[in-house]
A protein has these predicted regions:
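Core mid-bundle transmembrane helix pairs that form the ion/substrate translocation pathway
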Residues: 1-50
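Transmembrane alpha-helix interface/packing and boundary motifs in multi-pass membrane proteins
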Residues: 8, 43-55, 66-71, 112-115, ...
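Membrane-interfacial segments
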Residues: 11, 15, 19, 23, ...
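Membrane-interfacial loop-to-helix junctions in multi-pass transporters
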Residues: 27-41, 52, 69-76, 98, ...
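Transmembrane alpha-helical segments and their short flanking loops
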Residues: 36, 100, 108, 120-209
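Transmembrane alpha-helical segments in integral membrane proteins
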Residues: 51-52, 57-64, 87-94, 187-204
């Protein structure tokens, strides 16, 4: 403890801060120059930003967008699509398993991810099956394309984006167009990730019971 704590505070803390600043700047520049492409790409890499603990570097971008334009095109939309792709992937893993105990546990992880909390699904079912993460990325890209082509906006800044935070995408005027984009992009992310992961599991993890 006498060694680890000072190293964490003095060395790793500043490095993490600098890395977060760089990631935030790169993502902001990417969205400014090519938002249609940026949404699917960033949705696909978002789980790894969460894993590294630097996903919060994107939150100031969302806050700035809300303050200046009244909506956010970056932080919550990419997290929403990514989280749903992770949820769909975990449900595919659960369907693939034969052991009822593990099946039920991982299915609950998938439902939790669909609600916006992905850590149980990511660490409890996906990360030990690296090829399945390809299916997760495919689902995120598919949903992200819709969210990029029909710019998905959120009007409330919050955490843990998922189906439970759909009202974050409701405009102040009550129009439903953006909500439809949120629903369609989210459902596409779940379904495509589920199908892609199911195919990968059948081909690569036949021994997984």
């Amino acid at each position: 403890m006498l060694i680890v704590v000072p190293i964490t505070l003095i060395v790793l803390g500043p490095i993490s801060t600098e890395l977060s600043d760089v990631v935030g700047s790169v993502i902001q520049a990417f969205f400014n120059s090519a938002s249609i492409i940026a949404m699917p790409v960033c949705s696909a890499i978002y789980p790894y930003l969460v894993m590294l603990g630097i996903d919060k570097a994107i939150m100031p971008i969302g806050a700035a967008g809300l303050a200046s334009m009244g909506y956010d095109l970056v932080y919550l939309p990419m997290g929403y699509i990514s989280n749903l792709a992770v949820g769909g992937s975990a449900l595919a893993v659960a369907m693939h398993l034969k052991d009822k105990g593990r099946k039920g546990m991982i299915a609950s992880f998938g439902v939790t991810a669909l609600c916006g909390v992905t850590e149980p699904a990511f660490y409890g079912s996906l990360i030990m099956r690296p090829r399945v993460l390809i299916g997760t990325a495919i689902g995120a890209v598919a949903g992200g394309l819709i969210g990029g082509i029909f710019p998905l906006k959120n009007y409330v800044l919050g955490g843990c984006p998922g189906f439970l935070s759909l009202l974050f995408f409701l405009p102040p005027d009550g129009s439903m167009g953006n909500m439809v984009v949120a629903l369609v992009s989210g459902i596409v992310a779940v379904v495509v990730a589920f199908i892609a992961c199911t195919v990968i599991l059948k081909k690569s993890y036949k021994e997984d019971v």
